[in-house]
C-alpha cells in the first residue's frame, strides 16, 4: 500500500474521533507538535523507527514525553500507531490530518516559496491571490528557496503555479535547444 494511503487512513480515523469529541483544533495541534518533536529529534527517531525496539518500550517513551502535552485520545492513537508498527508514518498522518481539518474549515493548504524573504504586506497579497485561485480560504506556509532566482512558486494541493525565473530560464533553454537540434 502506498505511504500516502496508509497515512490518510490513519488520519481519517483520528479525524472521526476528533469530530466526535469536538476537539478538531486541539488534536490537530497536538499531532502536529508530536510530529515536529519526532522529526526534529534524531535520537527519538532512532528509537521509534528501530525495528528491534519493542512496541511497549516505544509506547512508554511516547507516554513519558507527551502525557502532559496531549490528550488521552491522541496518546492512545499514537499507541495504536506503534502497535501496528506504523511509527514512521506519524509525520504523514499529521499532514493528512491537517488536510482533513482544513477541508472541514473550508480552507486549503498552500505552500508559497519565494527566492527571497518577503514582508507581511507581500505575504498578504500572495494569500489573496492564492485564495482567489483556489476558490477557498488559504492556509499558507511560506518558504525561501534562493535557487528560484526570483519570482514565486505556489502549491495548492496537486496544483503548482510556477512563476519563478528559474523555470522561465529552463523553458527558454529548452526551446533554444530544440530549435538548434
UniProtKB/Swiss-Prot annotation:
This is ATP synthase subunit delta. The keyword Transit peptide does not apply. It is a peripheral membrane protein. F-type ATPases have 2 components, F(1) - the catalytic core - and F(0) - the membrane proton channel. F(1) has five subunits: alpha(3), beta(3), gamma(1), delta(1), epsilon(1). F(0) has three main subunits: a(1), b(2) and c(10-14). The alpha and beta chains form an alternating ring which encloses part of the gamma chain. F(1) is attached to F(0) by a central stalk formed by the gamma and epsilon chains, while a peripheral stalk is formed by the delta and b chains. One of its GO terms (cellular component) is proton-transporting ATP synthase complex. It comes from Desulforamulus reducens (strain ATCC BAA-1160 / DSM 100696 / MI-1) (Desulfotomaculum reducens). GO terms for molecular function: proton-transporting ATP synthase activity, rotational mechanism. Belongs to the ATPase delta chain family. NCBIfam families: ATP_synt_delta, PRK05758.2-2, PRK05758.2-4. InterPro entries: ATP_synth_OSCP/delta_N_sf, ATPase_OSCP/dsu. Pfam families: OSCP. HAMAP family: ATP_synth_delta_bact. It is found in: Cell membrane. Keywords: ATP synthesis, Cell membrane, CF(1), Hydrogen ion transport, Ion transport, Membrane, Transport. Coiled coil: none annotated. F(1)F(0) ATP synthase produces ATP from ADP in the presence of a proton or sodium gradient. F-type ATPases consist of two structural domains, F(1) containing the extramembraneous catalytic core and F(0) containing the membrane proton channel, linked together by a central stalk and a peripheral stalk. During catalysis, ATP synthesis in the catalytic domain of F(1) is coupled via a rotary mechanism of the central stalk subunits to proton translocation. This protein is part of the stalk that links CF(0) to CF(1). It either transmits conformational changes from CF(0) to CF(1) or is implicated in proton conduction.
Amino acid at each position: 500500500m502506498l505511504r500516502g494511503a496508509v497515512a490518510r487512513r490513519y488520519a481519517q480515523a483520528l479525524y472521526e474521533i476528533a469530530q466526535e469529541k469536538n476537539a478538531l483544533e486541539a488534536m490537530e495541534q497536538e499531532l502536529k507538535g508530536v510530529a515536529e518533536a519526532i522529526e526534529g529529534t534524531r535520537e527519538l527517531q532512532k528509537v521509534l523507527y528501530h525495528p528491534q525496539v519493542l512496541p511497549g518500550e516505544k509506547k512508554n517513551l511516547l507516554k513519558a514525553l507527551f502525557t502532559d502535552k496531549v490528550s488521552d485520545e491522541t496518546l492512545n492513537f499514537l499507541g495504536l500507531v506503534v502497535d501496528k508498527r506504523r511509527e514512521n508514518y506519524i509525520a504523514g498522518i499529521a499532514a493528512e490530518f491537517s488536510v482533513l481539518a482544513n477541508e472541514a474549515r473550508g480552507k486549503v493548504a498552500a505552500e508559497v516559496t519565494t527566492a527571497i524573504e518577503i514582508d507581511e504586506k507581500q505575504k498578504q497579497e500572495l494569500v489573496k491571490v492564492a485564495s482567489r485561485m483556489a476558490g477557498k480560504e488559504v492556509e499558507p506556509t511560506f518558504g525561501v528557496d534562493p535557487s528560484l532566482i526570483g519570482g514565486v512558486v505556489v502549491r495548492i494541493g496537486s496544483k503548482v503555479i510556477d512563476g519563478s525565473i528559474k523555470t522561465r530560464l529552463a523553458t527558454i533553454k529548452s526551446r533554444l535547444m530544440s530549435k538548434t537540434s
